Each structure stands twice: as C-alpha cells, then as structure tokens.
Amino acid sequence: MAARTWRAVRPLISRHASRWNCGHGRFIATDSRNRLSRFWTPTGLVEADLKAQDAQQKDAKPNAPKDHSYSFLARAGYLRQVQSGIFHLLPLGLRVQNKLEALIDKHMSSVAAAKVALSSISTEALWKKSGRYSANSELLRVKDRRDSGFLLAPTHEEEITAMVAASIKSYKDLPIRLYQIGRKYRDERRPRNGLLRAKEFVMKDLYTFDYTHENALETYEAVRSAYNNLFDELNIPYTVAQADSGNMGGKLSHEYHFIHHSGEDKIWSCDGCEYVANEELVQHKTEEKPSDHVMVYTAISADHKTRINIHVGMPGAKDQYNTFVWDQHLNPHAIRSAVEALEVELATGLEQDTLAHLVSNTTNTVNVYDIRLRSQLDSAEADKASHDLEAILPGDTCPKCEKGHLTPAPGIEVGHTFHLGTRYSKPLNAVVATPENAEKVAVHMGCHGIGVSRLIGAAAALLHDEKGLNWPRAIAPFEVILMAAPGVPEEEVAEVYDTLSGAGVDVVLDDRTGKSLGWKLKDADLIGYPVVAILGKAWKTERKVEVQCRRLGVKGELMAEYQDGLTKFLGRL
C-alpha cells in the first residue's frame, strides 16, 4: 500500500523506477527510460546571447536576410555561445551531434574507412614543408615555453600524410582510407550565423591513399557515392556542385550544399540539364561579340612587384586604361585563375588609393586577355587569352547543354570532396616502391570533409518555421516525444512508451512536473521533435493516441494502432 500511495503522489513512475532529489530540487527518475526530467533542457529566450549574435550578423553583412536558426538553437536549449564564434553544446545538442556522427560512421564503413583520432595540435614545420603555413592567414598559431611553433589545426592533411608516410613502403600497403571526427579551429575574422561560421567547429575528414591516379579516381567516386547515400538518408534537400579546389590542391572537387538565403556561396544551375557549379568554377557559353574597344583593368601581384593588366572587350565603350575599380562585368575567380596560369599570385582586398600607389612602384608587367580578344592578338599574346573573364549573369547560356540558362542560388556548404593527387605526398615524402622495384613514386591522395557542427546549423536554418526547429528523423535528438494529459495513469503511459521503444522508436517521455500540457506542446514545437504523441481525451475514451507532425502537416490525427502508424510517419521523415 505504501508503494502504491508513493506512486500516486509522484506520477509517471513505472516499474523498476525510482526518483531522487537533492534537497528541495526537482525529482529525477532513474529508470532506463528516456525522460526529460533527467535531461537538462534550459529552453527559453537568452536575450544577451541572441543580441550579441544579431550584432555580429549585422556587422558582417548589414543587408543580408536575417537567419533565425541560431536563435532557435539557443532558445531550444541546444547550445550556448561563450564568445564570438565559440559555443558550448548542451545535452540536446550533443544528442544531435552524436546521431550525425553515427550516421557518418555508418557510411564511412561502406567505403572500408578506419576511424582515427589525430591531435588538434599540429607542428609549424609540417605546414611549412607543405607550403600552406605562410599562405593561410586564418591559422590559430601558438608557441610553447620553449618557443616552439604549433597551430590548432583547421585540417589534417599534413599530419596524416606524415603519419602514413612513416608506415608505408610498397604499393602493396595501399589503399589506405582513414577518417576522423573532431574539433577544428580557424581564426575567423568575422564569425557569424551561429554554427555556420565559427572559430571552433566539428568536422569529419576522410583521407585516402592510392597507388595510381586511376585507383585514386575510383576511390573518389566510391566516396562520392557514400556521400550521396548519407545525404539521401539525412532527407534534407541538397545540391552537388562542381567546385574549385582552392589552396587544397588538385583539380577534381565537388561541394555539397543546402540551398538557403543565409548561404555565403553562390551556386549556379542550368534549367535545361544537370549542370551545377559553384561561383569559382562556373562557366557560360562564350558568345562571340564585336569588341571594337578595350577596357584595361589594373591589379597587382601579392608580392607587389608585378603590375597585372587585364584586357576585356567592351562593345560600344571607349578605350579606357588604368582602371583600378573592377565592375560587375568581370569574373574575379576567372581572373585569378588566368593570373595563376602565368605563375603570378593576385593580391586582393586592396583599397583603390593603395593599389594605385603600389602599382606605380612595380618592376614587372604581365598582360591577361579575355578569350574574345584572341583573334585581335598576335600569336605570342594570343596564348594569354585562354580564359573567359566576363562575369556570369543570370540567364547566360549553359556551357554544357548550350540550350538551358543559368540561375544562381545561395548555398550553405556542408560537405566537400577533393582529389588531391600528389599535392601533399610529394613534399611530405609519402612514397612507395613500384612492382618493378623502380624509383619510388608519390601516392595519390584524396580529402573528403563534412562539416558536422555546420551541418547541424544548416539543418536548423533550412527546416525551422515560426514555431521552432523541425529536425529530420536521422539526427533529431529523439524521434518521438510522448506526453500525457493529467489523469492518465502512469502505467498506461509506461505501456505506450515501452511499446514504441520495443518497436525501435527513439522515444522520450516528457514527465516534467509543474508544466501544463499546453506548455509542453509549445516546448516540443520549439525543440523540433519529428513526431509528438499525446495521451489525452481520445486516449481516455477510445484508447487512441493523438499524433502531430509539423513537417508532414499532420495535426491531431488519432491512432488506435499507434505503433504501426508512428512507424509509417517516421519512415517519411
């Protein structure tokens, strides 16, 4: 009788359960069921935190559309901001991250990748050997008491290449596929948009090592297939774009994007075929135009020694020279590629007056020509007219099908695949003996990343509505939240919970005391559980569970066979 009386006073305590409290604090169940009474879920508005984040976004991009995803993540109790670009994950946020990492582990296993954990501290020496140390201004550099130089690694190409190089001797030791999921660091000048651009972030990076170029390309396609399967299972619309490798090296690269107004990348797609490319790599069909007049823009090399004259045909314009301000007619990415082809690095971000002063002191001059000027040049200069320097504009003709038209859209990059070739293996001496025992050859590498914390922020940006977050099933903190109206016996709530859990549903019970059913429903919307299951009036009278699912537009559906019904709902999420 005493036990029965105690359970009546403390509702929603099932068999094999107990509760304890510290002093006069909240009671916490200690059974094996997932209960919100056992989670720290500090939901609610965090004014100071959100105002600081809004100020950062306004400072970085004053006219950009406001992104509410970070405010929902903070209000729903997923994270807290410590400083600009630095965040603490709370229990709900960690569950989302753990689920995403488990999904990544599953698909990395499909390409026979082994998991490692490299140190976040890398040595300056390796980065100097690869040539990336001086070229990267966003490295977080540190020194120890002996004045030895280190850095907090943003990526691990150097470290993992050196480690593998010390362990391989023959082509028979290959292929090798190693990946890790860990914290990375970048000295972001303007952190913004919450998890989308932070100083500390979690990333999955896979590194592949193959004997031949052909083997490396086969590996690249296998990883791309695994990525497609991963993003398909995630069930969030995504776009794969051809991309430029940048300072990572290599020529083959693809990016995975969520299309959203808060994205900082511009993704171009054709309305007539499957052509998709990012703004660094996008091309359009080169249209021949009469170019009676030439506009010459002026730039300078990164070492300030070389003047760069950029010649572009301007139909209907007057000849004009020494123009320091580039306009919307130029493609800065194409210009950078054209200049790099001449083995000159382009300086960017200089003010007009500064550029004009520096150019007056240069000792060398190189000329770059738009491809449309080729017919007007002598043979020596025509070789320098190999790039289309005109800006890509909406409606331009697709270079692939030559029929469709190009349209831009903002994208959030959440994944990237690189074929690196021998970019790192050569300088770091990752070589193997060949079958003929001839001179050793450098191995061919690939690097494939997924921004784990960024993907969490991107999913929140893409799927939230005015009520709150709206997680896909694969990474939701829980798939179903179960709650009961006052008066529903705890044994019946436990029975429904156990039935769902036994069917493989990841369910959590909202057993928090002192909160009304209406408050719990609003809190569930804010947190973003895929499915809300309610034991209310219909349960008391008809033994039916009320189900809500915002992502599918379902509200108030009653289910007698709730186990099968909920499983079908989740299958669509």
Placement of each model-derived feature along the sequence:
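NTP/phosphate- and nucleic-acid-binding module
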Residues: 2-573
